[in-house]
């Protein structure tokens, strides 16, 4: 199995603060894994994502993503690198006054400031692909609805559709279901699981620990600046997971 992310003895702190946020983190993430990142608030889960996308430099250690040393990237290399990564957050990055279809077109367009120029050169195949992705995500009937008319779960599906159209290789999801009810959260995780089975790698910062066992391949817990737990979910029961989490947090 190919390594997508390799962190070796990474330590991080913000600005000139003396306290480390993460300390000597060593971690490998493999292609096609759906990984839950868990831990108390403020322990460095979001910081880990910033390290992976090279928006925050560690004070020591080595980082490889897609088998590239991202700490040595120039501007062009970083741009190409970021284009392979998709992001999901609590609040989808959408234009709420526009419809679903147009939001997806805008997200893939190099003519973002000239939307109608891009729309006019879309091929029939590209248009069909957009509708196919919306159909896969059960929101085809919402294609020409304004985003503001959709539920929170449907809005997240639109955001996911954007990532599918862009064909990203790695998805970093920072609590994408925290504003959703339990059933909708499960539906979103099922979608992410299906995407990971297509050899896409997905890391999810998640707060609802009851969802970890059934919907993730692997769980990594961070606390006190360290990785304190890293297991395949198939190798541990929900009872064992709950017990270990309670003892570490």
Where would I find each of the regions flagged by the language model?
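The feature captures the beta-strand-to-loop junction immediately N-terminal to the Walker
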Residues: 38-40
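Conserved ABC ATPase signature
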Residues: 146-150, 154
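H-loop/switch region of ABC-family ATPase nucleotide-binding domains
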Residues: 206-207
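Conserved ABC transporter NBD signature motif
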Residues: 61-69, 81
């Amino acid at each position: 199995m190919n390594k997508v992310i390799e962190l070796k003895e990474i330590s991080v702190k913000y600005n000139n603060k003396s306290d480390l946020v993460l300390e000597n983190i060593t971690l490998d993430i493999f292609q096609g894994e759906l990984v839950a990142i868990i831990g108390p608030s403020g322990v460095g889960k979001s910081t880990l994502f910033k390290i992976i996308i090279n928006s925050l430099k560690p004070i020591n250690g080595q980082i490889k993503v897609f088998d590239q040393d991202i700490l040595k990237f120039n501007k062009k290399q970083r741009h190409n690198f970021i284009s392979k990564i998709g992001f999901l957050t609590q609040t989808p990055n959408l234009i709420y006054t526009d419809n679903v279809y147009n939001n997806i077109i805008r997200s893939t367009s190099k003519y973002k400031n000239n939307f109608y120029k891009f729309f006019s050169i879309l091929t029939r195949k590209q248009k069909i692909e957009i509708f196919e992705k919306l159909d896969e995500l059960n929101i085809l009937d919402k294609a020409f609805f304004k985003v503001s008319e959709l539920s929170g779960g449907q809005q997240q599906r639109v955001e996911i559709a954007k990532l599918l159209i862009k064909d990203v290789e790695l998805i970093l999801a920072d609590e994408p279901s925290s504003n959703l009810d339990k059933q909708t959260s499960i539906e979103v995780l099922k979608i992410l699981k299906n995407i990971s089975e297509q050899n896409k790698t997905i890391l999810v910062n998640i707060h609802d620990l009851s969802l970890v066992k059934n919907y993730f391949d692997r769980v990594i817990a961070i606390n006190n600046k360290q990785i304190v737990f890293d297991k395949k979910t198939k190798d541990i029961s929900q009872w064992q997971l709950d017990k270990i989490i309670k003892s570490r947090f």
